[in-house]
């Protein structure tokens, strides 16, 4: 593949994505959990290993229900410490939401938002990412999004610190980042979104800090497999299969 050109063989993954919503309540606990379940499409141009899809679905489900169970146990502990009703009971609510932000070239990028409130006061706000190579089932790391031999840690660190310095009042004084290999991120058609946890580099009231590295501005550094846009989407089965074969050799 010519590294000086945008990928011209982008194609959508042929997956069926089932929307699931689980709602329930008891006296002091309410939950509304939304999440996807992935399935192969019959006669699609490629079939993801069933074990890969099963592992992905189980991982997403476990993240949600483990979070819900932890908050439920907290509610039980708080409210059972007050059996005589001398103190006001605490109402807990748990939510999950998701976005499938990239679904092309046998790669998916999904973000899962987990939030919990007590008496309408936010207590937890976690953002999970699932960047999966559907050929191998492996979780993609930040290094995989860049071309070989790119000093991606310095590149991303410099970009994020530049953005922080553009708006310093939004962040903690002297906030500076040194991006690790396991940095949290997700993919979109537009670029790579680097993000941090609540209260990590900015006060929690500012929500989760995110930084978009647009592919168009970093084209010479980006692995073309991930650089897709409306102008290079391909629906031709033959070309998609050719890309799949090339991809297996290259990676």
Give the label of every model feature segment.
Residues 1-251:
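Compositionally biased intrinsically disordered regions enriched in Thr/Gly
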